């Protein structure tokens, strides 16, 4: 066997191994993407009913009220007095007697109401029942119904625990903070005006204003039927005085004085809630930290060791101290699934970290904290919201994970809180089956102001869905004892409309859902049609026709939401990707960002499929028609019948906003689905449809921005990501043609090189360079001989052709929009070649240039072939949606990439030997990796990835603005530093191998 044959066999085997490795990487990439689709069983609520609306009965006047003393009765009687404030001067004079038994069971709020002529009597075994009777009587009068219709026995509420957030208490409605619409922080900044940076730490005037907010919120919530509240905060109220081995905060540390000031300031808030029969639960993420506490954990436990019970005892002791100091506090609500910068309060060093990530950590936390709660007669509400975090990432939706984490934890002080949807608060999701299991006390989470459905700025009647869900869950799990309704919270506070509960904007729209949730908690079979009519009568009109029209509009609202904000053929599926379950609303990335990235839109099209594209498009039209009918319902009402003309205007304006938005979204869905079809089929008709839909969308988007930019009540949606996607798509066809032309030229260069090796064509100008590149790239051991005797032109072409082709190919691959990508790629290649050139020294550099350049041409041909179909959009479409094509492409691309370095080393080995040639290559690779990674590290990995992704449009644009790409993909921020370090190691090894070694000779004579 000749040397050339042996080398050829080695080369073939090497290439086959590289292709196999590349195929393995391709398969691994597919597994990492983890895109799987299965059927999803969505909820099946009844169709909304419309109550028969009768004329209101005259409002009575209560001239004599005999009720027990106490804050709860005072507040209830104030509500009744307010409900009868519009009674006519000649209204019927009514007397009310209220009696309450001595029982102290807060769960028993049963009562009996009797009417005897002009005398009404409420009797109840408990104070809670008697107070409820007064509130129900007030609601009956507000609804325009006769007190006689309320007569009879009313049993205790089905669910005794009914909690709310704190609404918008302490939040200042400043339009200038909402107008930009780009602040995606989840911090409400409640009580911001109350806090001072220095002693006394509290602004008393602002505190008084906040207390007025609190009083109104408490009275409203109690009147609706709620009896618990989740108050944000914990770590700012404690000083960890009992921490073993402490102190956490040394004497004189401002954290100690600030905690005392905050406790003193907010104690009256908590006490007032207790006076009105409302339990107060502190609400915190875990781990809740300060720099000092983090240092304490590091010194004592070596870090935040969340599986160590002693760490959790530090928190338990702090809670015990707080409960002893503030007896109005009843427990704590804990979340472990979200944290990070968007949850941290500006100006404070209190923050939270995603550190509770294992089963043992969760169980240890709950064991310690519930033991403390049992001893202090308080409760721990544990939210199962874990959203992909660590080993407990799917605990919130997966029964097996739920059982593994919580299965045998047994404590009467533990309440487990879970969202009713199998995921976040989206439509189309199945019921959360983890709520049907377990022996723990359970509460169900609802959200009134649906953050993913336009932040409550569109009418959105959730009542039938909540009723169906609660009915199903109660039938399956008798341990469910309550609900938690989010009246305002959830999502970013200042990236949507400035609708603040009881304060600003059209908050009455989502207050409707808060009422319905309370009604269902008391009676899961409540007549929601009547609840809706009562809501409409209280806020908008006493006219039966107007009330009926409003109820009809609300009944249509879900069709507009479910079809307009979702793509039904996709939303009805359950999708998994990257180990998570993307929401059914992927094309709207978190709240108001219309996404334009290829990963999302291409996968959406692939799951919908070409056979259901028209169905998905039709859904947008159905939604738009529903919104237009809703507007007609309201428009046809008599303006004179409305209590407040401004509320009628608000209703019409919000429907105009919804119609405008849904029309824009309908055009966008048609646009990107047509584009996906073109990438999928190459159909000219699909491309033409995309062009028409694009023009329609652009016109609607411009009109939308013109109409709503700067409108804090109806903010313009964030269309930046969508526009970036359009900018790229506009170039696809041009880039595809450019790629085809370059592909022909590259193939011509390749063919010339192949033919020149055996024909007289080699004598033509440039042919020798093509021949050298072909031979050196396929048989690098012949690189030196193939470059001998070349003319200056051929030597230039050896550099210019591969280099120019690489520049052009990579530029086309990025649609000429990502200079960051080009800088990284070209910078790395130039660094590699520069180091190799220095290493080669006085020897001819053309063998290695020919070898690397020839492989670069082959690698560019592969990319140009992929781009030649429908441009970069088609390239990425195939990557995201075609597993076989993805594996084949990665296998070939990887093999050629590595072969470039193998060929470089092999070519130089003919000049300096195998060891030194290997050192040259490693030194070049190490230098390129180290310097490129160092540059990324200096810029910051998150910032670099954000800029790169903005230009390439591969992942959701909003990801970087909200959680961060590194956080979402769990990429450590230190990664580029480690890569730079690895590059230095490779460089050092390469330099060592590259040095000329001389054997020692023994010069001693023997």
Regions found by a protein language model. Name each.
Residues 1-18:
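N-terminal Sec-pathway targeting helices
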Residues 18-119, 125, 146-152:
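Acidic, contiguous N-terminal accessory segments
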Residues 36, 42, 178-180, 184-185, ...:
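C-terminal non-catalytic alpha-helical accessory regions
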Residues 63, 76-79, 107-110, 116-316, ...:
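Feature activates predominantly on carbohydrate-active enzymes
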Residues 85, 167, 227, 256, ...:
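Catalytic-core regions of glycoside hydrolase
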Residues 734-757, 981-989:
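Selective detector of the "anchor" transmembrane alpha-helix that sits immediately C-terminal
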Residues 772-859:
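Selected alpha-helical membrane-embedding segments in polytopic membrane proteins
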Residues 836-973:
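Hydrophobic alpha-helical transmembrane segments and adjacent short intramembrane/lumenal linkers
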